[in-house]
Each structure stands twice: as C-alpha cells, then as structure tokens.
Amino acid sequence: MAAEIAEQPQVWRRLLDEGTDAIAAAAARIAERAPRFVLFVARGTSDHAALYAKYLVEITHGLPAGLVSPSTMTVYGARPDLRDVLYIAVSQSGGSPDLVQSVEVARQQGALTPAVTNNAGSALATAAEIHIDALAGAERSVAATKSYTAELLALYLLLERARGGDGRAADALPDLGAQVLASGELVRNVAQRYRFAQRLITTGRGYSYPTAREAALKLMETSYLSAQAFSGADLLHGPLATVDPQVPVLAVVPEGAGGDAMLPVLARLADRNADVFGVGAAPALENLAGGITLPSGVPDTLSSLLEILPLQQLALHLAIARGGDPDKPRGLRKVTETL
C-alpha cells in the first residue's frame, strides 16, 4: 500500500502522457451523442470516483446526473428507457458481474456506455461501447489507492474534453502530488495521536464529499475503525449530536466554494469541542487541532486528487500504529464480485 500511494504522481503523469488520445476520442463520441442525462454505475472505492464525476457533470456540464443501483437491473430485472443517457461505468478490476450486466442492459436500452477501468482485458471493458484505461498498472494492495486517483483523473479528462475543454489544468498535478506526499512524516504523527480512537467522522462538501467517503472507507478497510462519512451539510442535520471530544473529525476544507461552505460546519464542530484535523487551505486550518496544508491555486475540480493523498497515508500509518497489516486487511479480497 505504501509503495502504491507513493507511485500516484507517476501514474498521473503516465495517464497524461499516454492516455489522452483515447480519452479525446471517447469524449468526441460523447459530444456527438449530446446526452441529456448522465448516470454512473460503480461499487466500493470506484463509487466515490463516480460521485466525484457526478459533481463534475452537474456543475461544469449543467446536466442532471445520478448514481445507479445495479441491483435494480440485476436483481429486480428493471429495463429503464435509457435513450439520450450517457451511462458511465467505473471499476478498478472491471470484473464485478453486476456492473457488467448493468452495462449490457444499458446498451440494450439505448444508452452510450463508456467504462473506466484499470483492466483493458476485463469483462466490463468488453461489455462497454467505449473503454478508457486508467493506466494505473497492476495494483496489489487490497485497499485501492493509485487506481482511485487514476479513475478521478481519467473521469476529469473525459468530461472536460467532452464539454470542449483541453484538460491542461491537470498538467501540474504530478508535481503537486509529490509535494503533498512529502508530508508523510507529519501524517505518521497524526496516526499516533488517533491510534486509540474507536470511532471517527469524515466530512466535506461538494467535490470534497467523495474524498470524505473514500477516506472513511480506507480507514475501515485498513484500521477497522468505525468511520462515518457525511457531507458537511448532512452532518448538521442530526449526526452532529454524536460528536464529542472523544470522536475525531477529519474535515476536508479546500480552497473554493466547497471549502467556504465548510466554514460554518467547522464553527459548529468547535461549539462541540470536537477534535478536528483538517486537510485543505491554510486559513481554514488555523484554529483546528491540526492539519495538512494543500498547495494553493488548484482548481476545485481537481482538488480531490490531492486531498485524498494524506488521508490514504493516514489509513496506512493508523493501521500500523494499531498493530495491523494494511496490505492484508481481514476478510477482504482485491476483486469483489457482487450480483
């Protein structure tokens, strides 16, 4: 897991250098079809990449977007009318039968079906009308890290090209990612601080909400913590009552609208005397228990790739601090097949 976390800037560079022609061709087909609605289908970590892309579609394309429950097709036999729908599947392995079947049904029902996977030879890549390779390379860690951020970048480039952009804002990411990863020793110290926690909350808004969800999943997978993710808005609608000084809160507070929307949430957490550790913009972290400052000037559409890096490191170091092995989480397999 440690090696694959460290590899991510190289993975992004490879995708930017070698994957953009295929992505541009896929984007051209999407633009030609001019879909009126976008649906995403995914599981696990890839579901968080899909949620990030849902925000991209709704904010930058001005189209309605949603996340599909594959069971509506695979278990209940639903056959929705998907004409004028862009139906994007996201999967590291491309091997889960429910995703494959849902894409097959979506094609039959009239949707354009791109798939983003890290396995060009997978059943999902074959079932989809268009395949985009995330080019993350073999991922051996059960807890996905580099494939997740590669999916984020592939989805950003695809959707940015589909609306006529060039995606050049992503060119700086490899260097910025290396800069963020250099704070690993600070993250190790944070892990020591929280090693006895039994429960933890993660929170963010907008593009950072998927980051909060992915961070919670990584902590559950590797450290066996009961980690709950909430959008900053939803946290205030009830779950705030569960926060006390013994429940650490990991808050993602980047520059931009999403980070600004988190400021009232931080104020309410302070009222609860919460132990809040932040990842994001320097001004927002000043009054917290601690934090990792991210590079400034990064578009909020791309901040998700940088935000998750220290949180992946935290999951790694927290697992080790608690006596576990993050490379061999109990009860989990690299490829999970569901119907």
Regions found by a protein language model. Give the residues of each.
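Generic helix-packing signal
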Residues: 13, 54-58, 106, 110, ...
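Active-site phosphate/pyrophosphate-binding segments
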Residues: 3-4, 9, 13-35, 130-248, ...
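Glycine-rich phosphate-binding loops that contact phosphosugars or nucleotide phosphates
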Residues: 31-176, 205, 240, 252-297, ...
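Generic C-terminus detector
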Residues: 298-339
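Short, flexible active-site loop motifs that bind/organize anionic cofactors or intermediates
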Residues: 2, 89, 202, 304
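Hydrophobic membrane-spanning alpha-helices of multi-pass integral membrane proteins
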Residues: 247-255, 307-308, 312
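Conserved phosphate/anionic-ligand binding catalytic regions in large, soluble enzymes, centered on
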Residues: 1, 48-53, 212-221, 308-310
